[in-house]
Amino acid sequence: MKAKKYYGQNFISDLNLINRIVDVLDQNKNQLIIEIGPGKGALTKELVKRFDKVVVIEIDQDMVEILKAKFDHSNLEIIQADVLEIDLKQLISKYDYEKISIISNTPYYITSEILFKTLQISDLLTKAVFMLQKEVALRICSNKNENNYNNLSIACQFYSQRNFEFVVNKKMFYPIPKVDSAIISLTFNDIYKKQINDDKKFIEFVRILFNNKRKTILNNLNNIIQNKNKALEYLNTLNISSNLRPEQLDIDEYIKLFNLVYTSNF
C-alpha cells in the first residue's frame, strides 16, 4: 500500500533502526506505551514484545486494517482516531500503570500540535520519544543564543530533560522524504513547573514574547502589559538588558520575569 501524502506518511522497515528507536524508551516492561501514528506497525512489532501494554492511535482506516490483520496480541489495543481530537488524559485513566510513555514517528505537518498536546499531560508521563524533522529536533534541543532557539525549545525544557538522540538519514524511509529526521527524547520532570503557579499561562507568556524575534524583549513585553515604563522597570529589577532579543534569555530568566510580572498588578 502506498503512503498517503496528506497524512504525512513515511515508513521505516530497517530492523536495526527500529530497535535503536525503541531502545530510547525506558526498558521497564511494566508500563503503558502509547504509539502515535504506527502506520504499518514497524515499531509496534517491537513494542508488543517488550512492554506489557501498547495502545496505538492511527488516523488512517487502511492502516488500521493492516494492523488488525498483522497483530493478534492480547497486550495491543488499536484505536482509529485523530490523536489531536483524543482526550489523552481520559484515555490514560483507563489503565493502571505507574509508568506511561509516548512514542511517535511524527507526521511532519502536525509536529507542534502533537508536542504541545504531549506536554499538556506531562505530569502523567515518564518519557516521550519522537522522530521529527532534523531541523525541528535541533530547535527543540537548542538553548539561548542559538539561531533556532524559540518558544518550543523553552516549552520542552520547562517540562522535561531534552535529549537529541541521533540522526536518521532520509534514505531510511519510503517514500524518501526531502529532509533527514532525528530522534529526540523528553524525560519528564517538574523541576521548573514547581517554580510557577500556572504553567499554561507561562507557556503562553513565552509564546507571545517570541512572536517577533526581531524585536527587543522590552518591546515584546510591552505587547503583554501595555506599559513600556513598567516593562522596563521589570527588566531592570532582574538585571535583564532591555536591548536583548527573545533568543538571548534562558529559561530561568523567563521564569523570573513571568513571576515578577504576574505577581504585580500590571
UniProtKB/Swiss-Prot annotation:
S-adenosyl-L-methionine binds at N10, I12, G37, E58, D82, N105. It catalyses: adenosine(1518)/adenosine(1519) in 16S rRNA + 4 S-adenosyl-L-methionine = N(6)-dimethyladenosine(1518)/N(6)-dimethyladenosine(1519) in 16S rRNA + 4 S-adenosyl-L-homocysteine + 4 H(+). It is found in: Cytoplasm. InterPro entries: KsgA/Erm, rRNA_Ade_diMease-like_C, rRNA_Ade_Mease_Trfase_CS, rRNA_Ade_methylase_Trfase_N, rRNA_adenine_dimethylase, SAM-dependent_MTases_sf. Keywords: Cytoplasm, Methyltransferase, RNA-binding, rRNA processing, S-adenosyl-L-methionine, Transferase. CDD domains: AdoMet_MTases (cd02440). GO terms for cellular component: cytosol. Its main location: cytoplasm. Its EC number is 2.1.1.182. It is an enzyme of class 2 (transferase). GO terms for molecular function: 16S rRNA (adenine(1518)-N(6)/adenine(1519)-N(6))-dimethyltransferase activity; RNA binding. Belongs to the class I-like SAM-binding methyltransferase superfamily. rRNA adenine N(6)-methyltransferase family. RsmA subfamily. Specifically dimethylates two adjacent adenosines (A1518 and A1519) in the loop of a conserved hairpin near the 3'-end of 16S rRNA in the 30S particle. May play a critical role in biogenesis of 30S subunits. NCBIfam families: ksgA. PANTHER family: DIMETHYLADENOSINE TRANSFERASE (PTHR11727), DIMETHYLADENOSINE TRANSFERASE-RELATED (PTHR11727:SF7). This is Ribosomal RNA small subunit methyltransferase A.
